From Swiss-Prot:
Keyword Zinc-finger: no
Tissue specificity comment: Detected in primary breast cancer tissues but undetectable in normal breast tissues in Sudanese patients. Isoform 1 is expressed in adult and fetal skeletal muscle and cardiac tissues, with higher expression levels in the cardiac tissues. Isoform 10 is expressed in adult and fetal cardiac tissues, but not in skeletal muscle.
Effect of residue 180 to G: In CMH3; no change in homodimerization; decreased in hom odimer thermal stability; decreased in actin binding; increased calcium-dependent regulation of myosin binding to actin filaments; dominant effect in the homodimer
Annotated disorder: Cardiomyopathy, familial hypertrophic, 3: A hereditary heart disorder characterized by ventricular hypertrophy, which is usually asymmetric and often involves the interventricular septum. The symptoms include dyspnea, syncope, collapse, palpitations, and chest pain. They can be readily provoked by exercise. The disorder has inter- and intrafamilial variability ranging from benign to malignant forms with high risk of cardiac failure and sudden cardiac death.
Protein name stated in the entry: Tropomyosin alpha-1 chain
């Protein structure tokens, strides 16, 4: 009997230990599931962040494309401005040549005017000296007056042409200044676009590095998930084994209880037989 009780106590203790191990295995399983769920949530979050990074990359790619288009447009404007400057330089050269020719004509007209004035003076002196040749002198004087008028007309025309050339030169200089300002603005815009392009390129490199970092983290998380999945499978296997052990122990306890009950019945029967025997002996 003592051996049976001791064995039952040991079996109950084994049962309690098995139940404790099963509960611990269940707790490990739940913790592993929670960790797996947390890692899945982190993975989803990282995927969202990666999607956001890809969206930003697309946005910066569009910005880079716009910057390149603006740069090409600025280069075209700068080229057009340079062509305008070259055209203006050619026009200025032509105007300067025309001005030189006008100045030469003006100098010739002034020289003729001076000669005509000298001739007029000589004519006046000749009129005083030789009155007998008045008619001839008058004709000569008329010719000289006509030449004088022509010289004055040439001089006036040269003055007008000179003023017109000077006015055109002022307009051309103003156009040249505006063209130079446009060229300077185009150069400044090109510099700004180049700086913006550098910034976009640096941001793009930073985003590529960040995406690479996210990819490395994702690989590391996948590895951790795999390890935790293996641990979860191992915990489930241990839990199943513990449950089978508990089932076996419970069956063993049930068998021992049945055997104990049978022994009690047998002991009761033997006790009754002994009582009957004692009663019979007492009756005798």
């Amino acid at each position: 009997m003592d051996a049976i009780k001791k064995k039952m106590q040991m079996l109950k203790l084994d049962k309690e230990n098995a139940l404790d191990r099963a509960e611990q295995a269940e707790a490990d399983k739940k913790a592993a599931e929670d960790r797996s769920k947390q890692l899945e949530d982190e993975l989803v979050s990282l995927q969202k962040k990666l999607k956001g990074t890809e969206d930003e990359l697309d946005k910066y790619s569009e910005a880079l494309k716009d910057a390149q288009e603006k740069l090409e447009l600025a280069e075209k404007k700068a080229t057009d401005a340079e062509a305008d400057v070259a055209s203006l330089n050619r026009r200025i050269q032509l105007v300067e040549e025309e001005l030189d020719r006008a100045q030469e004509r003006l100098a010739t007209a002034l020289q003729k005017l001076e000669e005509a004035e000298k001739a007029a003076d000589e004519s006046e002196r000749g009129m005083k000296v030789i009155e007998s040749r008045a008619q001839k002198d008058e004709e000569k004087m008329e010719i000289q007056e006509i030449q004088l008028k022509e010289a004055k007309h040439i001089a006036e025309d040269a003055d007008r042409k000179y003023e017109e050339v000077a006015r055109k030169l002022v307009i051309i200089e103003s156009d040249l200044e505006r063209a130079e300002e446009r060229a300077e603005l185009s150069e400044g815009k090109c510099a700004e676009l180049e700086e913006e392009l550098k910034t976009v390129t640096n941001n793009l490199k930073s985003l590529e590095a960040q995406a690479e970092k996210y990819s490395q983290k994702e690989d590391r998380y996948e590895e951790e998930i795999k390890v935790l999945s293996d641990k979860l499978k191992e915990a489930e296997t241990r839990a199943e084994f513990a449950e089978r052990s508990v089932t076996k122990l419970e069956k063993s306890i049930d068998d021992l209880e049945d055997e104990l009950y049978a022994q009690k019945l047998k002991y009761k029967a033997i006790s009754e037989e002994l009582d009957h025997a004692l009663n019979d002996m007492t009756s005798i």
